[in-house]
Amino acid sequence: DEELVSAQITSVFLGYYFKWDARSQVGRMESYGFSVKKDGPVEGTYTNYENLDDALVSIHDYLKFVKFGFGRATDHACLDIRNGRMTREEAIATVQQYDGKFPKKGAKEFLEFFEMGEEEFHRVIDSFTNKAIFLTDEAGNLVRDPEGNLIKRYQDYGKGIVAETPKRESLFLQ
């Protein structure tokens, strides 16, 4: 901060001056040579234009998902609803398809870069996973689907917590 002040550099959040919408900017960026991901969406979402040069971002997005129960697909769906590109119902279906999927490519690069084993990686992530959000077995271990993805306890988008849900003093205490 001191270096920026002494160099008389001021940061400006452009969103204060004009509406920034990454998806609507993609076409213009492509006219300057930008390329989107041609073989499908990036891990953790349904878009193909962000985080193209860094697979490790998918680990950040996954950690957000295991801690808070939503990830980058939810972020993008909210923007798409707000900008009139998607209905709420379409967004729910899209989020359920993409949010929280284990980032296999990103995990592989992470393990190689940090010289970490897969078992240690999962043990550390599981220790920070919010077990109030995800299914656990009788022993308290997280339950995964056949693809290795965590399974959320609640899939009631917009319905709130259903009546059959056992009452707890706090969803954040285990």
Mark where each language-model region is.
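Nucleotide-activated chemistry modules centered on ATP-dependent adenylation/adenylyltransferase
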Residues: 1-174
